[in-house]
């Protein structure tokens, strides 16, 4: 997932852009680059690999300028090379881009027939030449951008700077998030893929809506909707700060976030209960007794949280629950019951497939509930109810604290549903919530055994294949454990329902395959 930063200021922006890109490293990337307007023309610096490589190049070849854009790229169209890295530059513009332009081949052929010369294999360069083509027709930067946006098909966010316009920075979004930042210095304005990239610069953020494009000038943002009508977008004051995003005493962000779990689970739980520790959610715009089914849509780790929630809704609320991978659900055209609830789970609140699934569910008349870590996100804005996880910024690529806070919210929601439907007694609900209140201290107890966990990890690290097994509620945990091992160690791992081991997986097990069984003391073990 790529990252965008754009800055318009009165000071040199290259160091600020580089710092913003470092804050977007968690999104994953294989190359990075910057472009600024220098003495009336555009200069750029790009590098393969780590941002440190780009920083080294900037030390050798400094990049002045008071307006600029930066990008971290994860290759989709074209190999991860310096030539394919962003920004892409013509004699009139520089462009950075997240997402995919689906009709770039047709546009590229059209532009090549007009003698536009392409240097890269990317779809992004097509945007730069398309805007340039409209500029060559004597359009203004704003007119050229609006015209180009109408030709582009796909999901994307872009940022553009223009030769001869040192006080102009344009951004646009369609299916990919883009935030506008307002500087403490009234003359500074910012663009970012998310608020994290802008955290050290400002806490005043507005989020572009689907189809919006924005023109930034000193101290001013003019937002246009998809019909090019000027609109207002609310400015939010975020709680993020540069200090919150540091690694502190930890070697890497994921380890830091693992150790933050007790605190953030406690904070999330405190937001969902009253003074007696009982679930106390805000009024919901539906009656649980009239809900025929809950449809949970999510991706990756959030999907596994949804699988756990399915068990809770069925067992605690006696309510039918369906869980779907959002990337599959959005294309299935599944029938949805009248009066149903669609529940979206997403750390960022910007997961494109989950957002598309919710648009479908909303069109089917479902009430939308969002469990997200970013209350101002696109998914949150689309929803009827937002139940935030208070995990704080999650920088590590592999989700940890967001997952456990999602489970906290989902359990409280299922308990609330069970009580409302009259199928869960107050006594049992109190007992469940007492157990939940003990979770932070239990996690602390496990984390104190870090040395033993490291010893076990050394044994697993030598394996080529690992099997995770669980039953009931813990089957989704087995799936999540296998996903984490794959993400972090690149060791092949699979999660299975324990009862299914004899139906295939057992044939692959020998003395070299570790089997990790999640086996608590319950009715199944």
Positions of PLM-derived features:
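Glycine-rich phosphate-binding loops that contact phosphosugars or nucleotide phosphates
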Residues: 289-438, 518-525
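Generic beta-strand/beta-sheet core signal
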Residues: 96, 161, 172, 181-183, ...
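Glycine-rich oxoanion-binding loops at beta->alpha junctions
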Residues: 66-83, 271-286, 309-345, 351, ...
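Active-site phosphate/pyrophosphate-binding segments
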Residues: 261-265, 269-295, 364, 385-516, ...
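Short, solvent-exposed amphipathic alpha-helical segments in soluble enzyme
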Residues: 20-24, 85, 113, 174-177, ...
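Conserved short alpha-helical segments that host acidic/polar catalytic motifs at enzyme active sites
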Residues: 1-247, 251-252, 260-292, 426, ...
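Short gly/pro/ser/thr-enriched loop/turn and capping motifs at secondary-structure boundaries
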Residues: 117, 124-128, 178-180, 198-199, ...
